[in-house]
Amino acid sequence: MAGRGKAIGSGAAKKAISRSSKAGLQFPVGRIARFLKAGKYAERVGAGAPVYLAAVLEYLAAEVLELAGNAARDNKKTRIVPRHIQLAVRNDEELSRLLGMVTIASGGVMPNIHNLLLPKKAGGSKAVAADDDS
């Protein structure tokens, strides 16, 4: 039966290529697929779903890390700490909306001084005229 299948032990073994490397991603596609199946989100999980989810998660992580790195550099630091992540997320409109109800541990609060508490600007002739009327 020549030409039927491969003989056992013949030829070089093929090196396994991960689905992450096939998709050009750093996040683990296989692990995400396993979590999707184990989580019972659906009875069946398509082949492209874990790849797409891994790509989305990788993009979000890269976006947050880039903004947090900028916040760390603005504060003259070389290490990203939770405070930098908090500043990055809350200063970005879309990320702030996405993570609106999320508490970042050790993130602190956003610096904010109410306008009424700020000192009044000198030389405001309109403000003086308004006070004279009342």
UniProtKB/Swiss-Prot annotation:
Expression by tissue: Expressed in meristematic and non-proliferating tissues.
Domain of life: Eukaryota
Cellular location(s): Nucleus; Chromosome
Family to which this protein belongs: Belongs to the histone H2A family.
Cellular component terms per the entry's GO annotation: nucleosome; nucleus
Keyword Nucleus: yes
Gene Ontology molecular-function annotations: DNA binding; protein heterodimerization activity; structural constituent of chromatin
Pfam families: Histone (PF00125), Histone_H2A_C (PF16211)
The protein's name in its UniProt record: Protein H2A.7
Single GO BP term: heterochromatin formation
InterPro entries (alphabetical): Histone-fold, Histone_H2A, Histone_H2A/H2B/H3, Histone_H2A_C, Histone_H2A_CS
Subunit structure: The nucleosome is a histone octamer containing two molecules each of H2A, H2B, H3 and H4 assembled in one H3-H4 heterotetramer and two H2A-H2B heterodimers. The octamer wraps approximately 147 bp of DNA.
Keyword annotations of the record: Chromosome, DNA-binding, Nucleosome core, Nucleus
Function: Core component of nucleosome. Nucleosomes wrap and compact DNA into chromatin, limiting DNA accessibility to the cellular machineries which require DNA as a template. Histones thereby play a central role in transcription regulation, DNA repair, DNA replication and chromosomal stability. DNA accessibility is regulated via a complex set of post-translational modifications of histones, also called histone code, and nucleosome remodeling.
